[in-house]
């Protein structure tokens, strides 16, 4: 009763103040209008009154302490919805836009002792019948409405649904028999239910916890993956779905992990079982490496092998008959002999016993004694003199040969045709200053030799790039011979040639080459055009190597919160950085490093590189190689052979590949041609000098991998050499047919120009082009004009693969001292931005991205989830990679961002979402002004 009075007084507090003002103020006004006699008294009275009267502060809007929550009706049990607000004079429920009758409310009211405000709590009961009687597309919902003197407040809507769980699984797991260490996928789609059923897996009735056993993984689609099947994984697996209504179990799927038997190594051959004559030897092996288990196949083949053997029987030796006695000697003895050859001992037989020689006195003890003969002394003296004379003659001959050889060593080589019949005479001393004059035309070499013009005798129809050896090999030094027409470039070693050179010249060659390589290495290390770096935090960003087709996308959230990484991406041009390859393999991309190595990432980054492979992947086996910390190259991914343990994902587009990885390291894409139809794209670029004041004019034809970085390197190199692009580069499909690349020049005005190429064409060997390891590969055509007044050059250049495709360039050049040639925007000077950080690096606004992830990550019964998004965007080559991520949609959108950088293609993305029925996201994109 006291609580009720206090509540009534609290409600009336504002009203009493208002009544006092309305009643007292008019009365005071009447008193002020009374007679003048009491004016002074009235003034005193008014001075004693305050200007304003106290009143209660204004009451605030109701604030909900408890709002109704979603509820589920299990079987026929009704549910209660609760609502509490303060301050509130009234609270009512509204269900499906209709007010609930007052009698259905259970009201509890009290005054908060701290604030003195009224706290009102209301509850209602919802039955199954009420929910079932509702017709319409929307579920049954209820909402609280609270009143106070300041106004009304509405709570959130609470939906009431009838809970259920179907009995039949939409997809049940199926039993499998798998080999040891094979990946196993058990699929399960739980029954339809409200609320959505939770899924867990049982192994022999024990719950599987992937945290405890990391060999198990449960995907976001409720599928169970056994990463590498073990013998202990042989068990019965059951998918369990449960919610507040019921618990359902699928049929049991039996997984049997079998082991195929393997042979042990063969034992050593046994000794021949026959001690004399024919027999056999045998060796054995057992099917225990490993032994077959769980129905695995037994070893195929024989467990015992036998071979014939023959053991030779031993033969004991026997003496031949004694020979006749010899004549009586000077010592009065004679002798006779016999041999152990009748038969001789063989195969371990016993030797003959006894003496081989037998001697006895032949004069019955009577022997003559004679003095030494003086003739023997004369004989010995003659022999000694003859030996001395022979030694003297030998010394004289040796001195003569030594002097003759010494003169030959210091003399000049007058006729080089003695070394190779295909060249005119050349004097080595006169040509020494030109040994290191010109860089190579076709391939890089350790050192170079350039002499005067050579004429070729018996010129054939073509000059291949790999001639027979001109001279004998020179250890550790490759010397190329060039003529001024650029026609011949042998790669043979020349040891006998350098044996005629002085040691100082050979040392000069080596020192020059070492200095050249050192300078090139230093130049590349300090070349900023190959590297991009920047600082990034959890907001992510983009690193771009300008004009190289190489970039690194760091998604938002990839770097842990609160950390800042100094990241980089660089293109390697050193040949030592290229992975080793066999003859059937080719490098399809530049070698690219991203770092810092070992950085902790919470989601994959996207490394983008241009490649030169033909899009038909059926002719290719494409491998992603990674350089380990020790410098060794390892295969990371084989495209099309991914499994659950594959650490990276590769998306191959027509010209670029995108690598999703969480390991910052050095990568390169290598192609292995499975058929001769496999093709790679080449870029053909033709350069000439900016100005030419001599009669000779050189045209360089580069045959490069069709990547932006390869063309960028050549453009920089030619700019330093004073060259210019004569014609727009063209692409050529080069097949793995082992046929060479042939280059020829045609339609020259012979009255004005002549070609210094003596053959009809030049050829580059197939493997020089196919390997992709020959940097700056090119041929040179040298033309000579008859007069300096000739300033126009018109000709055609043909580049084609033998029995393959080709390209024809129509050249129309102006030869002058002023730079001429076409101006192609191959290197965009405005494209110098290397780092973009934060939200500006991404096309999709962050709120829309979060909305897409929240709505598409959860699996949908109709399949309108991240899997359909990947299918619509053609990113569904290996969905298991995305399924292992916490947000598959986010990783797919990261890959889409890298594909469409920098312009983005939001209109296409909006069209895909429209097809998937995501209208609200399309509206959001339109609101952003992007669609």
Curated annotation (Swiss-Prot):
- Gene name linked to the record: UNC5C
Protein's GO biological process: anterior/posterior axon guidance; apoptotic process; axon guidance; brain development; chemorepulsion of axon; dorsal root ganglion development; ectopic germ cell programmed cell death; positive regulation of apoptotic process
Provide the ZU5 domain boundaries.
530-673
Which range is the signal sequence, renumbered to this chain? 1-40
Any further remark recorded for this protein: Down-regulated in multiple cancers including colorectal, breast, ovary, uterus, stomach, lung, or kidney cancers.
List the glycosylation sites: 236, 361
Give the span(s) annotated as Interaction with DCC: 694-712
User: What PROSITE patterns does the record point to?
Assistant: IG_LIKE (PS50835), TSP1 (PS50092), ZU5 (PS51145)
Q: Where in the cell is it found?
A: Cell membrane; Cell surface; Synapse, Synaptosome; Cell projection, Axon
| Protein's name according to its UniProt entry | Netrin receptor UNC5C
Modification after translation (UniProt): Proteolytically cleaved by caspases during apoptosis. The cleavage does not take place when the receptor is associated with netrin ligand. Its cleavage by caspases is required to induce apoptosis.
| Gene Ontology terms: cellular component | cell surface; dendrite; filopodium; growth cone; lamellipodium; neuronal cell body; plasma membrane; synapse
Q: What is its main location?
A: membrane
**Coiled-coil region(s) at which residues?**
none
**Pathological condition linked to this protein in its record:** Alzheimer disease: Alzheimer disease is a neurodegenerative disorder characterized by progressive dementia, loss of cognitive abilities, and deposition of fibrillar amyloid proteins as intraneuronal neurofibrillary tangles, extracellular amyloid plaques and vascular amyloid deposits. The major constituents of these plaques are neurotoxic amyloid-beta protein 40 and amyloid-beta protein 42, that are produced by the proteolysis of the transmembrane APP protein. The cytotoxic C-terminal fragments (CTFs) and the caspase-cleaved products, such as C31, are also implicated in neuronal death.
Cystine residue pairs: 83-144, 95-142, 188-239, 272-309, 276-313, 287-299, 328-362, 332-367, 340-352
Give the sites modified to Phosphoserine.
502
Q: In which tissues is it expressed?
A: Mainly expressed in brain. Expressed in temporal lobe cortical neurons and in neurons of the hippocampal pyramidal layer. Also expressed in kidney. Not expressed in developing or adult lung.
Q: Which GO terms describe its molecular function?
A: netrin receptor activity; netrin receptor activity involved in chemorepulsion; protein kinase binding; tubulin binding
Q: Which InterPro entries match?
A: DEATH-like_dom_sf, Death_dom, Death_UNC5C, Ig-like_dom, Ig-like_dom_sf, Ig-like_fold, Ig_I-set, Ig_sub
- Which residue intervals define the domain Ig-like C2-type in the entry? 161-256
Q: Which organism is it from?
A: Homo sapiens
Instruction: State which ranges are Extracellular (membrane side).
Output: 41-380
Biological function: Receptor for netrin required for axon guidance. Mediates axon repulsion of neuronal growth cones in the developing nervous system upon ligand binding. NTN1/Netrin-1 binding might cause dissociation of UNC5C from polymerized TUBB3 in microtubules and thereby lead to increased microtubule dynamics and axon repulsion. Axon repulsion in growth cones may also be caused by its association with DCC that may trigger signaling for repulsion. Might also collaborate with DSCAM in NTN1-mediated axon repulsion independently of DCC. Also involved in corticospinal tract axon guidance independently of DCC.
> What is stated as this protein's family in its record?
Belongs to the unc-5 family.
Residues covered by the Ig-like domain: 62-159
